[in-house]
Structure formats: structure tokens, C-alpha cells
Amino acid sequence: MKALKVVIAVIIVVVSIGLVVFIGASMYAVTTINLLSNSVYYAQRMPHKEGTEPDLVMLIENMGEIYTPKIEGIRYDDDGANFIENSIDSSGHPTSFGEFDGGYHYSDKNDVSYKFDKNFELEWALDKDYKKIDLTTIDETKIKGEIRETLKPILDVQSKPLINLQWLFNMKYQDRFN
């Protein structure tokens, strides 16, 4: 009888531990998926230093997890370095924004290329003939506005999460964008 009680106690302990591990792993998975798939929504609402653009960064970094609707004129590429191309406007010259060399790259309608670092600060710019452009002649705010306009159709369709983990997202990313 005593052996049966020990066996039952061991079974209860093992099942309890298994249940706790399963619940913990499930909560971790749900939380991780939530933070990634809603990262643009959270980034749009996170306090951040002016000029850092966390929503644009999250859009590119988590492109495989966020909602990327089929929109005529928008092309997504995530088979290496993520980038988004927008050929919606009537100029005939597409714009693109993507990951590049530890930072981000933007190519405008005039084939001017801009390289931003991981904190979204402009590092260099090249004209269509690949000649360096003096950064003091560039309106960085205007360029960031163009990038935002390029990505606007995707930014606008990011929905509110069912479980709002804004506080956790802020804990994880706020130092990066301040």
C-alpha cells in the first residue's frame, strides 16, 4: 500500500511538472509570436527618440511575421535581406526600402541610394552615378518622410493585437530607440 502511494505521488509530481513546463512553453510561444506579429503596431505607440523610426525598423526586421497584404504595386522580398518595393505612384520609378549591411537602405525615384545605420541615422548617400553626396545637402527628415510614404500602405493595415503587450514590447525595445 505504501509503494502505491509513492507511485501515485511520483506520477502527480511528474504530471504537475510536465503541465507547468507545457504551460510555460505555450505562454512563451504565444508572447513571442504576439510581439513579432504586432511589432509595427507596438512600435508606432512606443515612446522613442526623434528620428529613430522604430515602426519602419520593425516593419523590415519582422517582415516575415507581420501582416503583409497583397497590394498592387507593392512587392515584398524576404528570401535574404528583407526589402519592400513600391511602384504605385505614376512616376514609373519604384522606391524600395530594406535591410542592408547592418542597417537599412532606401532607393528613391531618382535612383539616389541612402544608407541608414541600425539606429536609423543617415550614414551615406550615392547618386545614380554612384558618386557620394554630401550629407549636409540632404534633408534627412524629407527622406524619412518619403520612406514612410513608400511603406504607408503596409503601415496603415497593421491591426490592434488581441492581447496588448505594449508594456513588454517597450521593456524589450525602448533602450534601442532612445
Region spans (language model):
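N-terminal hydrophobic targeting signals that begin at the initiator methionine
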Residues: M1-K2
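Intrinsic-disorder/low-complexity peptide segments enriched for small residues
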Residues: I17, N34, P54-V57, I133, ...
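Extracytoplasmic electrostatic interaction patches
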Residues: G73-N178
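Hydrophobic membrane-insertion alpha-helices, especially the h-region
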Residues: K5-Y28
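N-terminal export/targeting and maturation segments
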Residues: V20-S107
